[in-house]
Design a protein with these regions (language model features):
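Hydrophobic faces of well-ordered beta-strands that scaffold small-molecule active sites
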Residues: 46-48, 128-130, 174-176, 314, ...
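Structured alpha-helical segments in the cores of large, soluble enzyme domains
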Residues: 291-307
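The substrate-binding groove and active-site-proximal loops of carbohydrate-active enzymes
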Residues: 91-111, 143-157, 266-294, 312-321, ...
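Core domains of carbohydrate- and sulfate-ester-processing enzymes
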Residues: 58-86, 192-282, 382-395
Length: 398
């Protein structure tokens, strides 16, 4: 008689597969679009990542351009050779820090990067990837206060444009970090601390809830009208993009603050809410038309304005935590750029095979390669590194 064997996955990274009589584990078959074209300039790029505040201080005049960090937290100016304040230091004897881990600044800026371009090029680098440079309270800048403005501690808009012009002279490219899943609680969009002229979501809804909680007979609609009148009387302005409606803020106080949805529970990073609407038939950031216009659709949108200022593309932070339809639209909008085809790079940590159809990202951060290298260099695990790399080869077509 005939012998029947099934061949399937052996559940090991880079393994050879296995046979069984029945119920073999399924293996992945990668499907991709052979006409999927990515920017040619990126294919031979050697990329150098820079955390701007710690790279080089090229202009000491901008070191004092801000007086506070998040809320009323002070800004700490550290000496270049000092260690940043961090929880490990807090456990040491004689610790004298403030136990705030993101308010110490060392003065690195765009001018500093520009002054070191000869050195950077001597390493064979032709593309820079900068961690976020938009106006933000922290030193890491993943808590945007204003997406459209460069942080004054990094430089001015004119300095940034001069920087990108110099890069183009050198045939170099610039990738910026786009953090569009969340913002800072100290921002023009949220304004938890009441610092900005534009009405932010937290000051708006906290005022509404305060009125409702102080007067149980007051309807939500009346509280909204009273809040609008109050804020306008104070000289506040409502953004035409409706910042005050971008977030989920509830009438429930937790630790003295009205509860809101935040990235991984960090209250400094309120998340853009997904809502029902017409763009897609489920809750999505794309259905928030004002937000989508602001980030990508408008002629002077965040994504387009930075490209117009000389950037070559975007690395999209926590890309898998934003609706994929949002990124499909993002791609359509940016790929119409006539000056140069911009790069769209997703922060994806695991297998990215599902993105090979050419309608989302041009590529992703190669963290799987990173993991294999760290495993080998730190732990000396050559076999483990080989298995991880073989798994990448299996998943990604050449």
């Amino acid at each position: 008689g005939e012998a029947l064997k099934e061949y399937g996955e052996d559940t090991q990274e880079g393994g050879q597969g296995s046979t069984s009589d029945t119920n073999a584990s399924l293996f992945q078959m990668t499907v991709y679009d052979p006409s999927y074209k990515t920017p040619d300039w990126m294919k031979e790029s050697v990329v150098y990542q820079i955390f701007p505040d710690r790279f080089f201080n090229g202009n000491k005049k901008n070191d004092d351009s801000k007086t506070t960090a998040r809320g009323t937290e002070p800004i700490e100016h550290q000496e270049w050779g000092e260690l940043p304040d961090n929880p490990r230091l807090a456990e040491t004897e004689g610790y004298s820090g403030d136990e705030i881990w993101s308010n110490d600044f060392f003065g690195g800026d765009i001018a500093g990067v520009q002054k070191k371009l000869d050195y950077i090029q001597s390493l064979g680098v032709n593309t820079l990837y900068l961690n976020p440079i938009a106006y933000a309270s922290s030193n890491h800048k993943y808590d945007a206060a204003d997406f459209k403005a460069i942080d004054p501690m990094f430089g001015t808009p004119e300095e940034f444009k001069n920087f990108t012009k110099e890069l183009k002279k050198r045939k170099m490219h610039l990738i910026l970090d786009g953090v569009f899943n969340h913002v800072g609680d100290d921002s023009i969009y949220f304004d938890r601390y009441g610092k900005y002229e534009t009405v932010g979501a937290y000051e708006y809804w906290s005022s509404i809830y305060n009125l409702m909680n102080d007067n149980s007979d007051l309807t939500k609609e009346d509280a909204i009208e009273q809040t609008k009148e109050k804020l306008l009387a104070e000289g506040q302005k409502f953004s035409t993009y409706g910042f005050h409606n971008w977030f989920n803020i509830e009438n429930e106080i937790v630790n003295g603050v009205y509860k809101y949805q935040a990235w991984w529970g960090f209250d400094s990073l309120p998340e853009i809410k997904s809502v029902p609407g017409e763009a897609v038939d489920y809750d999505s950031e794309l259905n928030n038309k004002d937000f989508a216009d602001y980030i990508m659709y408008d002629k002077n949108s965040v994504a387009k304005s930075w490209l117009d200022s000389g950037a070559s593309g975007w690395r999209l932070d926590v890309a898998n935590e934003v609706d994929t339809e949002f990124w499909r639209e993002f791609r359509k909008e940016l790929k119409t750029n006539e000056k140069e085809e911009p790069l769209i790079l997703g922060e994806i940590w695991d297998d990215a095979s599902e993105y090979f159809l050419g309608d989302l990202y041009d590529s992703v951060m190669n963290y799987r390669f990173r993991g294999a290298m760290i495993d080998y260099l730190k732990n000396g695990n050559a076999k483990g590194a080989e298995d991880q790399l073989n798994a990448v080869f299996e998943d990604y077509p050449q």
